[in-house]
């Protein structure tokens, strides 16, 4: 989000400055600690030699990459000192090990024990420099949270006793919470236990309220706790593509697979989680880029052959372009090798079937081995898709699916993929019913 970009840049800039200073301090320490093996007469000569200057430029960039892959820059407005400490400890240890074996081990100290002291110096200097600037920035951020100037705007769905208790807990911990409570949403005939002026409306007005208040998360806190009632509410909330959390009820403690999120002193459960952690998402994206680039290069001769074969078999374009819905339901143009005769949908969208007469003979071969999907490597490289994820669908079919299965909105919290477990299980779906059956597997992502 736009609000996050500002704080991501701020944290990244401070990290850059901290690592730049830390590397120079480490070089000073390194010069005196391993002086007998450093071929410079003075510290000044050591710090301004060409290699040291290049390393001074490259090291901060290296550290930013390490911090990025650690997931530190995800959700920058939800930082706290504990998470900062743990994340900084883990990432600086990882980065220090890489630098030690790539750079420091070439120093060849006279005493083997110097290796340990140099590594300890590298780790401790980088850790304290980085953690110090992060501590200052996060302290400032927490002060802004307490003043209500920065945070995640949330609504509580409910206005009864449970909602009232939750709001009091949030008020008591507002100094350390990233969530800014904007108000309550009345649900049916629930007995009111909060101030009337804090109730912004009911579920029928929720769309307008979310837009006006710039809401980023919803917390379900109704007095009724039965699963059918909760499921009915969730079906109304999924459409907004926001984080959805809920207070924890006694029956939730019977299940070990719920995803927890804790406000300070207020445990909540996530009802719309993504399965991958931030660092896993970063690693997945890097894998997508690497594999898609290699795939496009290595398979280019095959692409040429398939393109010629398609062109010779029937009139029409080689590539089939169609609008699909991607992450957060943003439309994009998907690419495929054409497997049908041109103009095969004169009367509107129509799903294909196993013996569909619109499919060309060579198109059947392409579909059998999924070769028609290969051009989507370009979609993956552009960031519109991933190698693995729920299959993207046309808006026409999405609207019909969500009418019967509103939880389908959850798949749009992640990027669609070239392949998925549902695709392996069901193949090409030839009806909305099969698409809904495939949803069971798509929700895994």
Q: What is the meaning of each model-derived region?
A:
Residues 85-89, 120, 283-290, 439:
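Hydrophobic alpha-helical elements at and bordering transmembrane segments
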Residues 88-92, 147-165, 317-340:
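Membrane-cytosol interface motif
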Residues 382, 396, 405-445:
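C-terminal terminal-structure detector
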Residues 50-51, 88-92, 96, 286-297, ...:
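Loop-to-transmembrane-helix entry motif
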Residues 1-18, 22, 30, 78-80, ...:
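N-terminal hydrophobic signal-anchor/signal peptide
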Residues 280-344, 379:
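A hydrophobic, helix-centered structural microdomain
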Residues 1-149:
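Signature of alpha-helical transmembrane segments in polytopic membrane proteins
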Residues 352-415:
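A short, structured surface patch at a secondary-structure boundary
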């Amino acid at each position: 989000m736009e609000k996050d970009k500002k704080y991501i840049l701020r944290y990244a800039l401070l990290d850059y400055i901290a690592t730049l200073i830390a590397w120079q301090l480490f070089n000073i320490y390194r010069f005196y600690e391993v002086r007998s093996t450093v071929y410079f007469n003075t510290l000044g000569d050591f710090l301004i030699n060409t290699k040291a200057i290049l390393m001074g430029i490259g090291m901060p960039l290296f550290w930013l990459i390490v911090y990025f892959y650690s997931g530190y820059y995800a959700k920058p407005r939800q930082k706290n000192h504990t998470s900062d400490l743990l994340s900084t400890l883990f990432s600086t240890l990882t980065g220090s090990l890489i630098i030690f074996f790539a750079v420091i081990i070439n120093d060849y100290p006279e005493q083997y024990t110097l290796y340990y002291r140099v590594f300890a110096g590298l780790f401790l200097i980088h850790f304290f420099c980085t953690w110090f600037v992060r501590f200052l920035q996060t302290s400032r951020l927490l002060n802004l949270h307490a003043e209500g100037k920065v945070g995640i705007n949330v609504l509580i769905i409910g206005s009864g006793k449970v909602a009232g208790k939750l709001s009091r807990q949030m008020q008591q911990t507002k100094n350390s919470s990233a969530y800014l409570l904007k108000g309550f949403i009345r649900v049916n005939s629930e007995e009111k236990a909060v101030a009337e002026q804090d109730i912004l409306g009911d579920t029928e007005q929720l769309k307008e309220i979310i837009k006006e208040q710039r809401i980023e998360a919803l917390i379900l806190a109704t007095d009724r706790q039965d699963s059918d009632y909760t499921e009915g509410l969730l079906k109304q909330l999924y459409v907004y593509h926001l984080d959805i959390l809920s207070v924890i009820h006694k029956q939730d403690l019977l299940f070990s697979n719920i995803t927890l999120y804790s406000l300070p002193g207020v445990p909540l459960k996530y009802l719309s989680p993504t399965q991958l952690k931030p660092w896993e998402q970063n690693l997945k994206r890097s894998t997508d880029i690497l594999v898609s680039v290699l795939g496009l290069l290595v398979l280019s001769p095959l692409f040429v052959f398939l393109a010629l074969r398609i062109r010779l078999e029937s009139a029409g374009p080689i590539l089939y372009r169609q609008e699909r819905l991607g992450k957060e339901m943003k439309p994009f143009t998907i690419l495929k090798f054409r497997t049908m005769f041109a103009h095969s949908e004169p009367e509107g969208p129509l799903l294909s079937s196993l013996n569909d007469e619109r499919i060309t003979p060579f198109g059947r071969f392409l579909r059998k081995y999924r070769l028609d999907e290969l051009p989507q490597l370009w979609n993956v490289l552009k960031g519109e898709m991933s190698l693995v994820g729920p299959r993207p669908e046309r808006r026409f079919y999405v609207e019909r699916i969500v009418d019967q299965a509103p939880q389908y909105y959850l798949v749009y919290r992640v990027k669609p993929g070239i392949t998925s477990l549902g695709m392996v299980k069901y193949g090409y779906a030839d009806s909305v019913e099969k698409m809904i059956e495939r949803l069971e597997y798509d929700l895994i992502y």
